[in-house]
Design a protein with these regions (language model features):
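Catalytic cores of nuclease domains that cleave nucleic-acid phosphodiester backbones
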Residues: 4-10, 74-186, 193, 197
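Substrate-binding/gating loop at the entrance of the active-site cleft, primarily
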Residues: 200
Length: 200
């Protein structure tokens, strides 16, 4: 029995996730925005050319591993690396979801070993697996999103967890960039703050 079957919610049937375009439909109607898109809209979109300009204008450029590469080659390498990381992150998410829903998982990656260490800690804390990849929504604000993992705490509350497969989680942004909208203008444009806002 899956966790969704074990712990159903009355609103589960009202929402549908569309992987293409990363959109949601609530009661058959597309929501205005996903939580992920809402957070991204508060910050400047990544501009590879601007970043490359900055790298090439540094005094230390000749020592960079990208030195001697064309702009196109640098961007192609970044794109390939990003696609690979995304695929591996998706696989890890899927394997964790399968694990908590009682399916057999074969994954010998170091990241999955980290997860199994977390699993030991989770049991020690008395956290009970409650839901995986739980799609939720807020009708008044036309928002929707997917919660990676929910656990029930010993005191009966629900704790939200978010799986991340990244090289580093940084509080300080590249170039000390800040958010571009009033609500986030005092928040650094770094993955730590992006992830925190998604969970808020």
């Amino acid at each position: 029995m899956s966790l969704a079957e074990k712990y159903p919610h009355q609103n589960d049937d009202n929402i549908e996730f569309q992987p293409t375009g990363h959109t949601y439909k609530v009661a058959g109607c597309p929501t205005t925005i996903s939580v992920t898109r809402l957070v991204h809209n508060q910050f400047t979109a990544f501009d590879a050319d601007v970043v490359i300009d900055g790298m090439m204008n540094r005094p230390s450029w000749s020592k960079s591993p990208y030195y001697g590469m064309t702009r196109e080659a640098i961007k192609a390498q970044w794109s390939e690396s990003g696609n690979s990381a995304s695929a591996q992150g998706t696989q890890l998410h899927n394997d964790i979801e399968d694990f908590y829903n009682g399916k057999t998982v074969t994954n010998d990656s170091i990241e999955y070993q980290y997860f199994m260490k977390f699993e030991e800690w989770r049991k020690q804390q008395g956290l009970i697996p409650y839901r995986t990849e739980w799609t939720v929504y807020d009708v008044p604000h036309k928002l929707a999103g997917t919660i990676d993992m929910c656990f029930q705490t010993p005191d009966g509350n629900i704790a939200i967890y978010d799986w991340k497969r990244v090289k580093a989680i940084r509080r300080t942004s590249y170039g000390r960039k800040m958010g571009i909208t009033e609500p986030c203008s005092a928040i650094m444009d770094s993955n730590y703050w992006h992830y925190s806002l998604q969970l808020a």
